[in-house]
């Protein structure tokens, strides 16, 4: 039996091609895209303006990503943390943070992670699999429906390394920012990476207007390699060259992330090179 595919993962262009292959007119694709990415339905039977024969075919070939809320924790400040169970049983975490300017959701891009950062719990079991574009979208849709308020900002800083799931993350960004969907603008999206340099260069060529955050966490290779194995492949000086290329190609500023670990990277001797060598050189700032 052929495995069903996630219709939520298809871009509008891909969905149009699929429907034309079924002998359907092109306008059906936009209607279906609206149902999935604007009206946020999770059942084909809810698509009331579609022919029943088409819905039956779609039901046979596709599914709509609709994770189950396994656990929900809400803090006093309104922050909501979800444990979401995907269709195959894998669980990921999603967090909604409320600010005066709107609601931000932190999404996962993988089930597990293979980057091996010493300070990150999500990497302990390694990477189980990449999430599909539609599954990442469904984190946002599930949270939005649960809180009953619009999600206005996205940070790709949950479980997984976004650039290690490059193609699906690019499709996710296309769908989530589409005017035919929830239409969250690129300037309201932040992507965090540990520094996969080849993928960073590939992202730069896309010239997206998102905000890039690079996990630095150390001023030099000795400390960073001890905290982040990725530094062995792409040491600090190589990463900084890639950051410079990204800035020059996109015209966008890059921010750095720096988790302070007592006795490891929190001394004045660490702070000075971070401030003078990295931040000032790239005209940027760090989130501590």
Regions of interest found by a model, annotated:
Residues 1-103:
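Flexible, acidic/Gly-rich N-terminal and inter-domain linker regions that tether
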Residues 90-210, 220-222:
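Conserved Radical SAM active-site core
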Residues 116, 152-158, 188-194, 223-232, ...:
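Conserved strand-turn element in the central/C-terminal portion of the radical SAM core barrel
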Residues 131, 164, 168, 231-234, ...:
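Alpha-helix N-cap and loop-to-helix initiation/capping positions
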Residues 240:
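Oxyanion-binding "anion nests"
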Residues 274:
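A glycine-rich beta-turn/hairpin centered on an aromatic-Pro dipeptide
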Residues 278-281, 285-288:
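Single conserved hydrophobic/aromatic residue that forms the stacking wall/gate
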């Amino acid at each position: 039996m052929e495995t069903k595919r996630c219709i939520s993962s298809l871009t509008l262009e891909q969905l149009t091609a699929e429907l034309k292959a079924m002998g359907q007119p092109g306008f059906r694709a936009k209607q279906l895209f609206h149902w999935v990415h604007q009206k946020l339905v999770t059942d084909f039977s809810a698509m009331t303006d579609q022919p029943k024969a088409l819905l039956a075919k779609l039901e046979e070939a596709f599914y709509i990503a609709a994770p189950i809320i396994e656990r929900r924790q809400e803090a006093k400040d309104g922050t909501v943390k979800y444990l979401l169970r995907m269709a195959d049983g894998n669980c990921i975490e999603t967090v909604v943070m409320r600010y005066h300017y709107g609601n931000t959701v932190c999404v996962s891009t993988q089930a597990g992670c293979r980057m091996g950062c010493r300070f990150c719990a999500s990497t302990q079991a390694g990477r189980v699999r990449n999430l599909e574009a539609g599954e990442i979208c469904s984190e946002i849709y599930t949270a939005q429906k649960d809180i009953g308020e619009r999600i206005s900002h996205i940070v790709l800083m949950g479980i997984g390394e976004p650039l290690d799931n490059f193609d699906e993350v690019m499709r996710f960004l296309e769908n989530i920012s589409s005017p035919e969907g929830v239409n969250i603008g690129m300037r309201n999206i932040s992507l965090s990476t540990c520094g996969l340099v080849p993928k960073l260069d590939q992202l730069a060529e896309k010239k997206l207007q998102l905000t890039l955050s690079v996990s630095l966490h150390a001023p030099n290779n000795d400390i960073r390699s001890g905290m982040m194995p990725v530094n062995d492949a792409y040491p600090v000086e190589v990463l900084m060259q890639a950051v410079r290329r990204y800035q020059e190609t996109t015209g966008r500023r890059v921010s750095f992330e720096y988790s302070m670990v007592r006795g490891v990277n929190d001394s004045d001797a660490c702070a000075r090179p971070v401030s003078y060598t990295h931040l000032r050189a790239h005209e940027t700032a760090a989130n501590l």
